[in-house]
Amino acid sequence: MHVTIKTTEEQEKMRIAGRLAADVLDMITEYVVPGVTTEELDRLCHDYIVDVQKSVPANLNYRGFPKTICTSVNHVVCHGIPNDKRLKAGDVINIDVTVIRDGFHGDTSRMYFVGKPPAHAQRLAETCFQAMWRGIETVRPGTRLGDIGHAIQTFVEQNNYSVVREYCGHGIGRIYHEDPQVLHYGEPGTGFELKSGMTFTVEPMVNAGKRHVRLLPDGWTVITKDHSLSAQWEHTVLVTEQGHEVLTLGSADRRMH
């Protein structure tokens, strides 16, 4: 495993990329309404990144992915491809965006409610949000990756939900996906020991039903096998000498956390 430790200069570039990614999710919030298509949301995000931020959308053509954002609606767990289907009141959607600025990546995702959400969908999204933060709050030098996963898994399962195991967080920097893999389940005191200067994502996917998932024939879209709702939140995190710094904070964090 090759884990990159970012220099002070590289950390500042990661901060900038992270802020830009968070700004995209703040910008798109007002457009997530009944009747809009995920294709339209994708176009708005793409144009904002390219024309306003003067940055690069990392997802577009990454390993063949055809769009700028991932839009995962209701029982879609992750990597949903924007299309021309209109969102309807009561839908829940995760929007996942990664921005490249000056060679460095900022990666974040957030849950949005289309109109007024059903109570059970709101509870799932909020539980996932709190689970992500439980994981992030363990991050400091000397913490092990298993501690992050254990904090997330314990909280999720206490709330009678399940953690998806096939997809995980990842190191990030000049390279979009680098070491280490950050699992959202695990045993405390196990796994790689965190060191100051590491940057990685924490991005739990939480299902209302069972944890099992299925990949659709498009090769990207992942759904819950039992068609239960799924939620995800994601931040890019820097390990500091004192603890951690979240590089992708946005308006939703200030509102919910």
Annotate each language-model stretch with its function.
Residues M1-H257:
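Active-site neighborhoods and metal-handling regions in enzymes and metal-associated proteins
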